[in-house]
A protein has these predicted regions:
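Glycine-/charge-enriched secondary-structure boundary and capping motifs
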Residues: 6, 14-23, 161-163, 248, ...
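Glycine-rich phosphate/pyrophosphate-binding loop regions near the starts of catalytic domains
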Residues: 15, 24-234, 240-249, 264, ...
Length: 690
């Protein structure tokens, strides 16, 4: 609902009362979800330009040069609230929406990533949400033929009642064939293509801009869209064929705020008149407000010259898609909606699209770190607890549901990053962040998320091209939450600037709180990162290899997996030095290592258990610190001979080989058999399969 202040501001600006269609348009387009009214000043601090950035923030997706003849379109979106109310359809339509964002740039979607965040799996409701979100993503992605090649899973009590479903899509397009979402000239027509419009998703943008109520599953169900991936597949091929004609002048996906959002934003540099009665409908008796604001899926809006309308219609019909010539671009900077000859909305377009007042929220720093308390449990018990935590455990139950090889470009998807072959180079992809660390130290945690994703790319020898983000936070009306948000954006921007990685697009999702579970999510500025390098697969260390750690280990247990399973507390990791990322990237590029992985969740123990489960380690100092600390900017590397690391600061920790994972330190040892490791790492799969 529009606030009383906003409604009064609009009455004064227009000099009259608003129609119901106008109120609905402003309610959605002035919502947090569409207008970024709480975050615009912060977002302007991010570095958005770079030598390969062809089109940065402001369109449906960003365009980044990959080679002289190939560019990537990349975007990232959230579908958080819908995925709680209806996890299957909420997640599925989240995939569909970001795919259409990339498609609207004239790009063929080639890959998806899905960083996901849930409450702990000891609660049946969270298991239900987890299962159906993954099913929704898998079914939609598989049906449209776009591989899900990378993801992230985080389980924390703060996400109970408000899971986060973030999706990254990447597409490819020739640099000279890029479409944009801004109309080109008055007199051109706006043609709606795709599914018929129904009442599903009504008010979705407004719904995404408030807390989840206790009865959200029932009361907010009409705000959740229902997807049809088979229509989406036809729409992909139809839009690409239309773009190939050179007659599509601009294009936009119908997402948040439906036709009202797409057409007003598209025509914001001129004006538009929309004939709502011409829209092809799925349900009888729909009124103009419903037609304009419904968020029915699988719909696109294209601008074409009047003489080319029939050409677009013929292509749509070839793919058995419905289409309607529903509007025109006008020179007058107004947004006009008619229905059966009656004007039902007539407002200044710049007021609707760019006139949202900026919110200025108070902020309050906080201190959340607690003193470290050493756990009483034996090291082996702690090791098995950490390995069985779902953040660390094997993710096979998830990725086995995804078709990762469709389109035949996927080279590798396991371990640190996904690799796709584009022409003769590799597109390397990573995603995610660590909400527990960011909660304790918002600035440092967000900055370290940049380093973590760049580290994943470095393990495959790739250099970052760009970042996209989803800024997921609780309600900014709480001063401590707005401080989290501010510090996270500043940390992200400063590290991206330092590493010269432009932030080219993204999404803001606020009000992630649950009345039902009485939770506020931990701050989650989830990232997607794309990089470029030589084509290579991740390789496991070989027997006899020397294992070494590059990068210094600190006493950083706060927000760690060890902290999650024991409540030990402690300090979160400090700001890491990004210089080590370049060192490791060069090592990989020069072929001096036989295997490499970065150290992140679960520390050295988790890394070694996954990449070299049969190894002999000798640790100096405190084994708790060596095994479980989660200091950023560290890598586990394998080399045939330590001489390969000459001139690089490192610490040898062991060798690959043997019958088990054996760890020795002064005064103690730990042996984990292959059976024990497999049982611990399979904990999530066992839970979800039986």
């Amino acid at each position: 609902m529009l606030s009383a202040q906003d409604l009064e501001l609009l009455r004064r600006a227009l000099g009259r009362d608003l129609t119901d269609v106008e109120i609905a348009c402003f309610d959605n387009l002035w919502s947090e979800h569409c207008s970024y009214r709480s975050t615009k000043p912060l977002l302007r601090t991010l570095p958005t330009e770079g030598k390969d950035v062809l089109l940065g923030p402001g369109d449906d997706a960003a365009i980044v040069r990959f080679s002289d003849t190939c560019a990537i379109a990349i975007g990232m979106e959230s579908h958080n609230h819908p995925s709680y109310v209806d996890p299957y359809d909420g997640a599925a339509t989240g995939v569909g929406g970001i795919v259409r964002d990339v498609l609207s740039m004239g790009a063929r979607p080639i890959a998806l990533m899905d960083p996901l965040y849930f409450g702990t799996l000891d609660q049946e409701k969270n298991r239900y949400l987890f299962e159906h979100v993954v099913n929704g993503i898998a079914d939609y992605g598989n049906c449209i033929g776009v591989p899900v090649v990378r993801g992230e899973l985080v389980f924390d009590p703060s996400f109970a009642g408000n899971p986060l479903v973030n999706v990254v899509c990447i597409g490819t397009v020739a640099p000279d064939r890029v479409l944009t979402a801004r109309v080109k000239r008055p007199g051109n027509h706006l043609v709606l293509i795709g599914s018929s419009t129904g009442r599903d998703g009504l008010g979705g943008a407004s719904f995404a801009s408030r807390d989840l109520a206790e009865d959200a599953e029932a009361s907010d169900r009409p705000s959740v869209q229902v997807g049809d991936p088979y229509t989406e597949k036809l729409l992909i091929e139809a839009i690409l064929e239309m773009a190939e004609t050179g007659k599509v002048l601009s294009c936009r996906d119908l997402g948040a705020a439906g036709l009202a959002g797409a057409s007003s934003e598209m025509a914001s540099t001129f004006g538009a008149i929309i004939h709502a009665d011409r829209v092809h409908l799925r349900e009888a008796g729909m009124v103009p407000r419903e037609i304009m604001l419904a968020e029915s899926q699988e719909r696109m809006l294209v601008e074409v010259a009047p003489k080319d309308v029939s050409t677009m219609g013929a292509i749509a019909e070839k793919y058995d898609l419905r289409w309607s010539d529903i509007g025109e671009v006008i020179a007058d900077p107004r947004y006009i909606v008619t229905f059966c000859g009656e004007v039902v909305a007539d407002i200044p377009i710049d007021l609707l699209v760019g006139g949202t007042p900026t919110e200025a929220w108070p902020k309050q720093p906080y201190v959340a770190e607690t003193p470290f308390t050493r756990p009483d449990e034996p090291i082996k018990e702690l090791a098995l607890l950490v390995l069985a935590h779902p953040d660390v455990a094997n993710k096979a139950w998830v990725y086995e549901q995804y078709d990762k090889d469709v389109q035949l470009q996927t080279v590798s998807f396991r371990q640190d990053a996904a690799v796709l072959r584009l022409q003769d180079r590799a597109l390397v992809l990573s995603c995610g962040c660590n909400p527990r660390h960011i909660y304790l130290k918002p600035y440092e945690g967000a900055a370290n998320a940049v380093i973590e994703n760049a580290s994943n790319l470095a393990c495959l020898g790739a250099e970052p091209l760009c970042i996209v983000d989803c800024l997921n936070f609780a309600s900014p009306v709480h001063p401590e939450i707005y401080w989290q948000l501010e510090q996270s954006v500043l940390g992200l921007g400063d590290m991206a600037r330092k590493m010269e990685i432009p932030v080219v697009g993204g999404n803001v999702s606020l009000y992630n709180e649950s009345d039902e579970f009485e939770t506020q999510i931990k701050p989650t500025p989830s990232l997607g990162m794309a990089g470029r390098g030589d084509v290579r697969s991740w390789t496991a260390p070989r027997e006899g290899d020397v294992l070494a750690v590059i990068g210094a280990t600190g006493i950083d247990f706060g927000g760690s997996v060890l902290d999650a399973v024991t409540g030990c507390g402690g300090s979160a990791p400090p700001l890491a030095d990004p210089g080590v990322v370049s060192i490791v990237r060069d090592l990989v590029g020069q072929g001096r290592v036989t295997g490499v992985t970065d150290l992140s969740r679960g520390g050295l123990l988790a890394a070694i258990a996954k990449v070299a489960p049969r190894a002999d380690l000798h640790l100096s100092g405190d084994p708790l610190e060596s095994l479980f600390s989660e200091t950023y900017g560290r890598f586990l590397v394998a080399v045939r001979d330590e001489g390969a690391l000459a001139g690089i600061d490192h610490r040898v920790v062991g060798t690959v080989g043997g019958d088990a994972l054996t760890v020795r330190w002064d005064g103690g040892s730990l042996i984990l058999t292959p059976e024990e490791l497999e049982a611990a790492l399979a904990s999530t799969t066992r839970l979800m399969c039986y």
